[in-house]
Amino acid sequence: MLDKVIRIISFFRILILLTTFSPLVHAASLDSADIERFLEQSSWGPTYASTQYCQQLGSFENCLQEQFNASPSLYPLIVAAPQRSIQLCPKGSPAICFRDNYTQYPNQVIFFNNALAGSDQLRQRVAFALHQIFVVSGVKITQPSYMVPYLNILLKDAFGNYRDLLKDITLNPAMGHYLDMVNNDKTNTAGTINPNENYAREVMQLFTIGLNWLNPDGTLIFDHQNQPIPTYNQDTVEGFAHVFTGWTYANPSTSLASKFPNSLNFADSMVLFRDKKGVDTHHDKGLKMLLSLSPNGAPITLPAKQDGQVDFEAALDNLFNHSNVGPFIGKQLIQHLVTSNPSPAYINRVSTAFNTGRSNGFGTGNRGDMQALIAAILLDIDARGALKTEVNYGHLREPAQFVLNILRTSNAQSDGILNQLTTLMGQNIFNSPTVFNYYPHSYMIPGTLVDGPEFGIDTSIAAIARENFINSLVFSKINVTGSVGTSINFSQLNTLAANPLDLINTLDQVFLHSTMDQNMRTQLLTIINSISAKNPLLRSQTAVYLVLTSNQYQVQR
């Protein structure tokens, strides 16, 4: 049998509808395989229409520009439910009452529908990557209404500037609640209240600079004892924690807060509380130590008695202008979109684009320009061109990408109720178990020195779940109460099944972008020929199942 890769899911609840299976058309002016690889990196999977359109545009730069210009498909605002679920969903209420108002289910359905059919594919893909860097989780932010503004920030700022994204996320109430910045108070005279350090630590470790000083190519900088040099210490954490004091929920639709702590409001950005005289009475007024500008440099300090807004902007500037941001964030976005193990040269080129704000004709020339950063990642020589055959190139398709790629590429019909599938594979969308994402970005494949972040959730259970998903999608029709379902139609493939080589060539083109190796092709041919030509459906189903469960498909290259 064909090699089975990595994991493949338990999908016991999907109703199957009919749709048309549309093979992708190879491009003429651009390299066909590269167009399809480009769309796998820049969208949730190539479709017949997207492949044709990119081909017609004539260049990857034009394809990128079209996506940069596409209007965002945002999450619709949801009216906040009462804090206590018993008020809205008393005992005896249908289960969907709690599901729709006190879980991330509504946002999950929107996510999958936008990923499957949204015209802003690149924005959707980048926003999800940013969500895995700036993690906010429904494990703590349970109401879907609370999460919507955060999700829309990721979409709106995906093509803007990283400094704006950093500010918008920092002042988002869902983030404020998740990492305890909202209602973070200054030290009181009795010493019983001290500024919370949670957001201060994570904004450095996860959202901007990482733990150790980096060269522009992402490699570590070492001290004279050949040890990595930390980017910050406890004094730095305390300095930022004191900066982030005095912020609370805004009064609805205003930039003011009437009290501290103020009443819950997840719809508007947090504000700095000021008393009737305009004084920020809950902001710490002491001297604050921030980050140094070089590995051996003295830390930047904020003077005492500054206004809280001034401290806040200066602290974000200090973070944003740190030399680590380009390689630290750039590498993570490369890992999400292209390959888990980018070369130092690749990271350096992407880092340069972040620093200069320009790449391949994109960008404003301002540091942190996201369009320049994205263009540098997707148009780089390490992303484009001939198929990359290095053993450590590419990345395991994370569950969301695995499911969505298959459905988009096969032109599936779906209602977007798909989160139960990815959850079984280890990725419960918008419910990351910790602030460190669904899987750690630094995860190495056991027994190797190769980064493989997505393998961090690639357990034996997840592997079985992936296989069960493919098995159910290809061979079964499983009814789900209240769900339209998801399905593909094999009618077109069935017409090819009489000639196994035609069937194999089509699947190679559709799913593997004409890169199927000879060993896999030979094994497929043997297996298909072992099935009677009088049963074209079984031939088609078996071939699709074997291709999608192969290691050649599981790893996006």
What are these regions, as identified by a protein language model?
Residues 38, 63-66, 168, 240, ...:
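Generic alpha-helical secondary-structure signal
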Residues 28-30, 36-43, 322-326, 330-370, ...:
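Flexible, low-complexity segments enriched for small/polar residues
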Residues 1-10:
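N-terminal secretory signal peptides that target proteins for export/translocation
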Residues 11-23:
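Bacterial N-terminal signal peptides
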Residues 27-28, 59:
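Eukaryotic PEST-like, Ser/Thr/Pro-rich intrinsically disordered regions enriched for SP/TP/PP repeats
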